[in-house]
Structure formats: structure tokens, C-alpha cells
Amino acid sequence: MKTGIQLYALIALLGAMTLQGAEDGKPSYDKSLIEGRRIARMLLGQRPTENAAVARSIEVRPRSGEARTIPFQSRVVVDGDGEWRAIYETESAGAAPAMRLTIRHTRNVAADFFVQERVREGGYGELRKLSWKEVFQPFAGSDFRIIDLAYPHSDHLTWPTQRLLDKDIRRGQSCYELESVNPNPGQGGFARVISWIDIDTGGPLEITGYDSNDGKLLQFSPKRFRKIDGEFKVTELHISNRETRSRSVLRFDFRKSENEAAESRQSALDAKADAEAE
């Protein structure tokens, strides 16, 4: 199944090989680490090729109490030279204020996070860069953390230890089982992450984060897909929080976005026609 993610392979084996002592005193190369680093570099090389806008919503299903839905808009702006921005605009949800979150992806792999609170209808306050600690906070009161929205630059693929555990079948697709190990698990986040990556497309089929005791913390998995322009795109992404026993569902409304895009194109054509008529 194609997930519509275009890959740009940035594979560099130099420096990716890990030496281990062998019985004969000669170094041996751990192929699983070499392949793991190669796959991580490939994923980090993914880039959007054009601007896009998608209407979304997050449904939060707590362990107790009623479920709630948080609508928001998102768009991708390609800035060129391998850099782009993902922008999320939310409505207020409980204690979480309406805000605009901007994630800036650079050629240096690491993402920067900026937030603006809405001060009036359609207006936003001062742009503030989030600290490393702040990006692990929930997004709009959901089980998604802010840093999770930066995938593939959501930090675990940049850790030095990347190991290919196996090639497996997941959801009927051939996939890599990739283990990412956090060198500093005490600084927040996961101790390790297991990702199942579609071999054909590079799209994630499942991602599970573990704590230092190897207990599951969060599990991400796409559940529904829709064929758009000949490619399958994720329309529903689930995340399970094992600590709070809650679940959040991220939904993508491509039909609404397509209608808005069509209306925008028609408005532009109408404006051009009016200008020519004058």
C-alpha cells in the first residue's frame, strides 16, 4: 500500500559503521547498526515537494469522562533549499488556549518549534521559541506531544544508535523493524523506540516508545487510508497512552481541504477575469 510519502535517499555509510572487538583481535562490523543508520538517514531525508493544506481534528478519549474533539487547521509551506514549515492553528480546548504552532524543518535535520497565542479573532501574539522541555508537552490537550508532530524530525531518528532488528510483515506490508536507543533517557522522552517502516514507501506503519524499564509509553499507528490522486494517504492516526490509559485519534479531512483549494483556485480565476474585464 502506497502512503504517498516521497523519499530522497541521503545514505552515507562513512562513519555509520560500528566496530566491535572480535575473538581474533580484528574489528568486526555490526551489520544491523550499519543498516539501521542507513534507514534512519533515509527517513530523515524525506521532504515535502509542494505546499499543502489539510483540515484536521483530534478526538481525545480519556479513560473516564466524555470524549472531546479539537478541530484545527494545518498547512505545509515549502521554503526551498531542503527547508519547510508545518503550521498548526488550533481552537481553545479546556485549559489549552487557541494558538498557532510553527515547526521549522531545516537542512540540519533538527526542528525548531515556535508558538503564538491567539489574542483576537484572526490575530496572534508574539512568536516565542519553545524550549526542549516544552516540546514534550501535550498538543492541544491531547495524547500527542508537540514533538510528535515533527516526524521524521521528532528526535528518535537522530539518536546515534539505530539498529535494524528484522524485516517483518506489518498490516500486510513488508517493513523494517528499526530500534532507536536514546543515549540520555533521563532528559525526557523515550528510552528506546521501535518503528515499523514500510520498505516500499518509507511510511511508518507503527511506532512504539518505551521507558527505561522497557514498559510501553506511547504507541502510534495509522488506522485508515484513502486513495487520493492515485496514492494512499493516512486519514486516521491513533495514539495510545499506556500511562493514562487514554487514546487520541488524529483525523485528516482531505475532502474539505480539496474543496477549499478548489474554491481558492476559482476565486483567483474570478479575480483575474474581473481584472481583465476592467
Each predicted region: which residue ranges?
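Bacterial N-terminal signal peptides
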Residues: Y8-A16
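Flexible, processing/modification-adjacent segments and terminal tails
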Residues: D24-R38, R47-P48, E66, H105-A191, ...
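N-terminal mature ectodomain segment of secretory-pathway/periplasmic proteins
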Residues: K31-G123
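Well-ordered beta-strand positions enriched in small/hydrophobic/aromatic, beta-favoring residues
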Residues: V54, A86-Y88, F113, Q162, ...
